[in-house]
Amino acid sequence: MKLLLIFICVWLSLATINAQSFNPKFFCFSDAFSRSEYATDPVAQAKLLKQLGFDGIEMNAGSPEQNDKKLEAVQQQNLKVFMIWAKVDLEAKEAIDARLYDLIPKLKDKGATVWVHINSKSRTPSNATGDSICISILQKLADYADDYGVRIALYPHHGDWLIKVGHAVALTQKVNRRNLGAVFNLCHYLKLEDPAQLETELTKAVPYLFSVSINGADDGETNKMEWDRLIQPLGNGSFNVLKVLKILQQNEYKGPIGLQCYALKEKPQDHLTTSMATWKKYMKKLN
């Protein structure tokens, strides 16, 4: 009898684990609108995202007036600004984007994250000689942001100094601030790293990730592909994006997921509708 009870308890525990829900918040990159009539209209952007079922948006750090308009438009639709796009320049006199000193206080306790791409004019990508200066800059930025409940995430980006998710994780460990983490960006990973190692690299990164971005893409020799094949509406292309989401689910990733939309040719209402329909299909399969 005791053995039967033990078996039932173990089975129930396994069933609970297997049935773990996976419903991350889903937000849209602001580049979804950059080549359209929506480009300078944050109100129209927010209304469309609300209509389609997105949880929020990423926005670029702008002037104080631009930031205020964007934040107000998003708030009016009961959406959230998940990410703020900004730059760190290792050699610049002002290494930290000065616009953040106006914007970060406005994000106080709103659950926002500033994701930074890190540039260097004198160092090649991933050159370790930049680590020490970068760590010092990031500690300063993270400490400032922490006073307002804002997080910082390191965004690997093709053409910058920080290009790989493993480097972002290593810097996160060295910076050692509770409000600083890393980003996994699918299109940049496919452009720069080995798709065959994606599961291994993503699994190692998950404990440090504050955000993930996805999009449709093609499979194959992705390092040789241009962006029109590496960034497509979700559901387009031959790359198995659902597998990426399964890896996140299996490793208990809890953060938001963003939709990369750079240089898409379709109208925003068209490609975003396609991507949202695919997202809902993915969530149904995973839950």
Regions found by a protein language model. Give the residues of each.
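N-terminal pre-domain/capping segments
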Residues: 18-105, 109, 177, 181, ...
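Active-site acidic/histidine proton-transfer and metal-coordination neighborhood
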Residues: 93-182
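Acidic-and-aromatic substrate-binding clefts and catalytic sites of carbohydrate-active enzymes
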Residues: 33-40, 56-69, 88-98, 122-126, ...
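Residue-level detector of anion-binding/catalytic polar loops
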Residues: 55-56, 80, 113, 151, ...
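Histidine-acidic metal/acid-base catalytic patches
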Residues: 20-30, 40-47, 139, 143, ...
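Bacterial Sec-dependent N-terminal signal peptides
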Residues: 1-21
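Conserved beta-strand positions in the central sheet of alpha/beta enzyme cores
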Residues: 58, 83, 115-116, 153, ...
